[in-house]
Amino acid sequence: CRDLQDRLVMIARVSDAGAFVNTNALTLKRSHGDYSVMQLLYDGSEIKAVLDFVNAGEVPIAWELIRSYSYMDCTFNAARLAAYTNEYRRYAEVSMDDLRYMPYLYLGQLLSSTYGYKQYLQTGDEELLAFGRWRTEMCRYLIANAGEVSAELVRLA
């Protein structure tokens, strides 16, 4: 599988470059960590409850921002990510380190996860395979563009 081969090459490349993020420099916030619209229960147009089976914990806010942005937009655009992040910054602090390391953190998290592929092999669900492939495409984009994304986030802050 080309995706698996590419992921192994990307992991080696990132590891050799020492690009994995020191999370001690990042702002931590209490959060669930993987909100999804699939977890929202509605009564008409009003959210009535959030269904979840995982406890909240402290996660890097950079992770929450880039993950939620990428699931919403599906195509990666540094200027739109910066606008999304700047809107959040109107309500809560996001440090320059959070912005600088955001794409590297996301790349490291995505590279270390087989989510989508493993579930596809267990269930045969094509949507899970598509999700795994989408995440690998995101890794390909970030391995080539993380530096530019990082610089754009800091520049537009």
Can you say where each PLM-predicted feature lies in the sequence?
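ATP/Mg2+ or Mg2+-diphosphate-binding catalytic cores
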Residues: 113-157
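Active-site catalytic-loop/activation-segment of kinase and kinase-like phosphoryl-transfer enzymes
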Residues: 1-19
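Helix N-cap / loop-to-helix initiation motif
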Residues: 94-98
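Hydrophobic packing residues in well-ordered alpha-helices of helical domains and bundles
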Residues: 1-7, 81, 132-135
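Active-site acidic catalytic loop and adjacent metal/ATP-binding pocket
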Residues: 15-63
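Active-site activation/catalytic loop segments of kinase-like enzymes and analogous catalytic loops
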Residues: 62-93, 107-126
